[in-house]
Structure formats: structure tokens, C-alpha cells
UniProtKB/Swiss-Prot annotation:
Gene3D superfamilies: Histone, subunit A. InterPro entries: DUF1931, Histone-fold. To A.aeolicus aq_616. This is Uncharacterized protein aq_328. GO terms for molecular function: protein heterodimerization activity.
Length: 171
């Protein structure tokens, strides 16, 4: 039986837009939770997983906005993989993700949270083919920051917000 999970989606049927629509957890959600708990020794709650995924999406979006500017500076009308500000740390996390992605089993979850940020330029095929790896690398980067910056096995909401601030400063 799938559990209900609140992703903060506002129901269009309600006139009161402060009401939140509850939806089923996306596939891969439980696998991410299991992997973080058993392999990374990080115990996340539904709330902290939601904060984690929102932070990953925010970092992904920030990468794209900077890449759009670099593409313009380079005289291109599309964003290429080379335009992304892939730091050495993120590159290492992407490589680690590629080694363990089968063990994590989060492909469906990454597809669910993957999105093209609202940029004005087209996205090159080389970059589109790397979405999953970049998102997976960002997940592992967040896990690394959780362990090193907070030292908490079960991070609180405040700890997750702190982690999001640290990752945000990287990009």
C-alpha cells in the first residue's frame, strides 16, 4: 500500500489556495529513503525528504540559470553541458552516483523531480542526457553536506534548511 505524501501541490479545485492537495508518493521515494538509511546512515522523515528534494531542484535550477548566462556570453543560442558550473565536488558526486545508481534504485524518482527550469534558451542534447546523473550527484552532495555539516543521523527541519543554504552558496 502506498503512503500519502504532501508535495505542496495546490489543488486547482479549491478556491482557497492555501489548501494543499495530498498525492501518492512517487515511485522511488521509498528506495531513496531506504538507501539513505541503510547505506548513508541518514534517517529522513517525509518532511526532510521533501526539503531534500526541493533543495536538489533549487540547486539544479540555479545551475541552469548560470548556464544560460554563460551560453549567451559564448554566443550560443542553446545551453550545453559545458555551460553548467559543475564544481569539482559535484563532479565527484556525479561519478559516485554513476557507480551506485543501480543500488540506489531511484531512477523513477529522479525522472519525477527532473525538470527543465524556465530558461529562455533551448537545452542541448548533451545536457539533456545528463539530467539524471546531475540530479543524482546533487542528491549525494546533499547527503555529504548533511553528514559533514550537521553530523546528525536524523536531521531536523532546521538542519535541512542549513544544508540547503550551504549547497546554495556553492552554486
Amino acid at each position: 500500500m502506498q503512503e500519502k505524501y504532501n508535495f505542496g501541490k495546490v489543488s486547482s479545485q479549491h478556491k482557497n489556495y492555501s489548501k494543499i492537495e495530498t498525492m501518492l508518493r512517487p515511485k522511488g521515494f521509498d528506495k531513496l529513503d531506504h538507501y539513505f538509511r541503510t547505506e548513508l546512515d541518514i534517517d529522513l522523515t517525509d518532511e526532510t525528504i521533501e526539503l531534500l528534494l526541493n533543495s536538489v531542484k533549487a540547486a539544479f535550477g540555479k545551475l541552469f540559470y548560470g548556464a544560460e548566462q554563460r551560453a549567451r556570453w559564448n554566443g550560443r543560442d542553446f545551453i550545453a553541458l559545458a555551460d553548467l558550473n559543475i564544481t569539482k565536488a559535484l563532479e565527484e558526486h556525479i561519478k559516485n552516483f554513476q557507480k551506485i545508481e543501480q543500488d540506489m534504485g531511484v531512477d523513477e524518482l529522479l525522472e519525477y523531480i527532473a525538470f527543465i527550469p524556465p530558461v529562455e534558451m533551448n537545452v542541448g542534447e548533451d545536457l539533456k542526457s545528463e539530467y539524471r546523473n546531475i540530479m543524482g550527484g546533487l542528491l549525494l552532495m546533499h547527503a555529504d553536506v548533511i553528514k559533514k555539516a550537521t553530523g546528525e543521523r536524523k536531521p531536523s527541519r532546521e538542519a535541512m534548511e542549513f544544508v540547503a543554504q550551504i549547497v546554495d552558496k556553492v552554486f
